[in-house]
């Protein structure tokens, strides 16, 4: 005896009933989520306001302490120093707290993204975004090495040069946006290592608009060779800095949101000093580029405004990179000598 044919409509109705039950559960979960979200928003506002009040009172306290310190007796100086160190420590704790609270974007992010909130609320999301930023720098650095090598030795075309410079503009613009978001999420990036990306963006934009001609051809090979070397050094820095940061984070000596940078910082002193000759050579190459462009600008045949406007950013990059690196090295030598005297 044959079984009755399946009822397609009945199966659909049973599936619909199952979906209805699941949907009711989803609705309840979503309602609970909305309630918790409102509670979270209120907690964020309360915490932000409390931190703002505390920071204001700390600033007032630090100012009063600074004014009265010269008149303090010698036996009270140690207590004043201890209070100052506690105030600085408290300010650092507030910085870590604010990394998990919504905040207003700075001028640059407001111009680019508007008032959208870019604060990531979990450690996992922050670390994932930081890790993606590091991979982005690594992959683009390798691509820039390949393209600059191709333009330098295989292709002599203004079109490919323009594509290379356009990639540089896009790369540095993207870095500035991502770094601003990371700063909002607790990354401690030193001022110059952020600002020099804005200078590099401007420089790449001017190079992009430089028309082909005698002055361009005189500087072209030097610029492409410098770009190759700079990308190679950046690759070395990423490779060794990422390993050093991993070890220091495991020891609890570095923050989880610390980033690799295109320069030298105090935490790199142990194990990464071998990078200093590469860095200083690159800094002086930037100075050489600036002097070359200034000499070209004095040539009677030079008609392009881009020559001088490329020389100035190269000079600024040299001054910023060289003296920032030199200051870090000087501070480390000074601290080591001070420590040895204490011993």
Swiss-Prot record:
GO terms for cellular component: endoplasmic reticulum; membrane; nuclear inner membrane; plasma membrane. GO terms for molecular function: coenzyme A binding; monoatomic ion channel activity. GO terms for biological process: antiviral innate immune response; detection of mechanical stimulus involved in sensory perception of pain; fat cell differentiation; monoatomic ion transmembrane transport; protein heterooligomerization; protein homooligomerization. It holds the Pfam family TMEM120A-B. It comes from the Eukaryota. Its main location: membrane. It is found in: Cell membrane; Nucleus inner membrane; Endoplasmic reticulum. Keywords: Cell membrane, Endoplasmic reticulum, Membrane, Nucleus, Transmembrane, Transmembrane helix. It is a multi-pass membrane protein. CoA binds at residues 130, 187-188, 237, 240-241, 283, 332. The chain crosses the membrane at residues 133-152, 159-177, 191-209, 219-240, 271-294, 305-330. Residues 1-132, 178-190, 241-270, 331-343 are cytoplasmic. The keyword Cell membrane applies. Homodimer. Forms heterooligomer with TMEM120B. Interacts with PKD2; TMEM120A inhibits PKD2 channel activity through the physical association of PKD2 with TMEM120A. Multifunctional protein involved in mechanosensation, and plays an essential role in lipid metabolism and adipocyte differentiation. May function as a potential ion channel involved in sensing mechanical stimuli. Mediates the mechanosensitivity of the PKD2-TMEM120A channel complex through direct physical interaction. TMEM120A seems to affect mechanosensation by inhibiting PIEZO2 channels, possibly by altering cellular lipid content. Belongs to the TMEM120 family. The transmembrane domain (TMD) has structural homology to the very long chain fatty acid elongase 7, ELOVL7, despite low sequence homology between them. This is Transmembrane protein 120A. It comes from Rattus norvegicus (Rat). The gene is Tmem120a.
